Amino acid sequence: MIAGLVHVRRHPALRTLTLTGAVASFLAFPLLTYLPVIAGQVLRTGASGYSLLLTSFGIGAIVGALATARRGHVPGRERAMLLYLVLFGGATVAAMASGRQWPAMGFLLVSGWSIVSAFSILNSLVQENALDALRGRVVSIYSLAFRGGMPLGSLTAGFLVRSFGAPRVIGGYCLVLVLLAASLHLLGPRAGFALTPDESRT
């Protein structure tokens, strides 16, 4: 495990991808935690409306996973991943701003599709940029960072929701996620995304 940590720390691409996974999961997944609150307080549809919202998100997630798997290895996936993060943030805010059930379902379908697509690409990039001998340990480190971001994001959101309400907190999280993706896009090579798998293994 120590060798994996050293490998991640020394390679800009792996370091950036791991941190991106942790921060993105921190910011994105509180949406699912507070979706019942959004259904009840924003859309005023109650339990039945929440079920439809969650179903829409799930359908989008399935479509995103299948589409990403079918597309396979294509150039420019790093940029596509960042675009998906921006799309998730925009669609989620639009779902809350719509104020109506059916438009919100459509936007959440896009949210599910885009966030799963982003994380699918992110996971494949981590594996491709890791040394063969250390791939298992590198993926374990990434998985720890990714999965650790989920509960921490929801925990932090819980404290903020008490003061600002769920819509503002989720909207703020989405804004930060969009800014993160935009920053990584502008940084380009300095963020480590210019490294190809072959270059990162040297």
Identify what each model region corresponds to:
Residues 2, 9, 35-202:
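C-terminal transmembrane bundle of multi-pass solute transporters/carriers
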Residues 7-29, 109-113:
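Pair of pore-lining "gating" transmembrane helices in MFS-fold secondary transporters
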